[in-house]
Amino acid sequence: HLLDAPVIGLVFADPHAYLERYSEPDKAKTKLGDETSAWPTPYWTVDASFATMQLLLAAHDVGLGALFFGVFNGEDELRKEFKVPVQMQLIGAVAIGWPMLENLTDRGASAKRPRRKPSEIIREGSF
C-alpha cells in the first residue's frame, strides 16, 4: 500500500550548496569548497538524512504514518518529470499518509527477525 499514500515526497541533497558555502572567505581555508571529494563525510547527505528523520518523526507526532524508502529504479524519469537540477543527489523518498492497522502477517522478513541484544550493537571503548 506504499504507493497509495496521499503524499510521496522525494528527498534530495545539494552538494553544490556546500561547495559554495565552503568557498566563502570565512570557510575557504578548509579547502572543502574545492570539490566534493575533499569532504571525508558528505554532510549534504547527512543533513538531508537528518531532515528526513525529523519529517518522519513530525508526521508520527501528529498521528500520520510515514516511511522512508529507496528509489532504486526510475530515477532518470523522476528527474525529467520534476525538472531536477543535475547537481541534486537523490537520497530517497518519503511516503506520508494514515497508518494502517498493523497486521503481523503483512510484515516483511526483516521485521520478523528477533531484535539484536544491545550488547551486539553497542560498543564501549573499542570494537
Question: What are the functions of these language-model segments?
Answer:
Residues 43, 62-77:
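GST superfamily/GST-like fold recognition
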Residues 6-8, 66, 89-93:
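Structural motif
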Residues 78-96:
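Short, conserved aromatic-histidine micro-motifs
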Residues 1-48:
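Glycine/small-residue-rich phosphate/adenosyl-binding loop
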Residues 13, 71, 98:
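Short secondary-structure boundary segments
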Residues 57-61:
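Short hydrophobic alpha-helices that are characteristic scaffold elements of the AMP-binding
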Residues 51-52:
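Alpha-helical transmembrane segments of helical membrane proteins, especially in multi-pass transport
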